[in-house]
Amino acid sequence: MDPNGEHSPLGFLPCYKPPGATSRDLVNRAQRRLRGEFGLRKLKVGHTGTLDPLAEGLVLLAIGSAARLTPWVLQHGKRYLADFRLGVSSESGDLESELVTQTDVKLPTAAEIEQVLKDFHGVVEQTPPAHSAIKVDGERAHKRARRGEDFEMPKRRILIDSVKLISYEPPMMRLDVRCGSGTYLRTLGMDVAAACGCAAVMTKLIRNEVGRFTLDDTLDCAFMFDDDDREKMSSEPMVKYLRPAIEGLTHMPAMNLDRQQIGMLQAGIRISGTPEAPSEPLPEAWIGCIDQVDTFDRNTDVLDCIGVDRSDGSSGPWGELVAILRPHGKLWHPLRVFPTTESITLRG
């Protein structure tokens, strides 16, 4: 609850992050604005996956208690459009560092690129770039890289659902990528180029999808980073773009709950029941690979389900989120519980 005794909001806010802005800055600015819209002194806001400053596109913000759902939202795949320039390299793998042109290098044909892309599917081993937010020995890698330190980045396994060559006008290559959390698109493009016998840097990156959320759903937050537009757009309420928290969990099995079960869960008591199949399940191939990927925890993958209240039909087609449930023998344990009175009316 907020300090005035009102219930806090709960949901996901799909935002468009402009290039040049950090995801943390987007969170901070959205938090200040939403506190004003809700009349709250405190409001938890987080993101469900960062975007590099030079990238743009969809950043899904978790509002209020929805931040507790991040491990399950991260199970969703993401979709990107990524542009690369072949035949050049940079220390950071993008335009943030000075470009070095390769000499005496023959650029690949489109057919050669498409042949190489066949090897980048399913579980793939990847070495993240040194200019990244990954911590190495307790410190962000990009800070150590900018100090000129020599260190080794740990390899990790990532999941690529599909990667397609959308256009190729040498030296520019555009890829359409569907992948799991933890994938570095800079590294993917550099690895594809290396397999073709050349170097590459990423020149543009757009995140188009996170699960069922798309760029078309987003609030364009560019105005929050432009002093000239900030006042002009101040009448546009951010809350109208807030989506029910359950929309980030439609890939999970769902159990319909009655009033007695809801009361038991809110008291921390395990319940019995049988969940329904997910309304928007993850692809079978995705589920088969998901526990092989370093960024996923099998305990929070396909084993859990959501408990929902569909008693009055006022919470949209999925119902109102009550709890995240984890199997415990023949019963279901309330891992995360959300009092139904905590939810606010959101657009369906």
Curated annotation (Swiss-Prot):
Top-rank taxon, per record: Bacteria
EC top class, as a word: isomerase
EC number: 5.4.99.25
InterPro entries registered for this protein in UniProt: PsdUridine_synth_cat_dom_sf, PsdUridine_synth_N, tRNA_psdUridine_synth_TruB
Active-site residues annotated for this sequence: 52
Any GO molecular function: pseudouridine synthase activity
Gene Ontology annotations of biological process type: mRNA pseudouridine synthesis; tRNA modification; tRNA pseudouridine synthesis
Enzymatic reactions: uridine(55) in tRNA = pseudouridine(55) in tRNA
Keywords, alphabetical: Isomerase, tRNA processing
Record family assignment: Belongs to the pseudouridine synthase TruB family. Type 1 subfamily.
Function: Responsible for synthesis of pseudouridine from uracil-55 in the psi GC loop of transfer RNAs.
Name of the protein: tRNA pseudouridine synthase B
Organism: Rhodopirellula baltica (strain DSM 10527 / NCIMB 13988 / SH1)
Taxonomic classification: Bacteria, Pseudomonadati, Planctomycetota, Planctomycetia, Pirellulales
Gene: truB
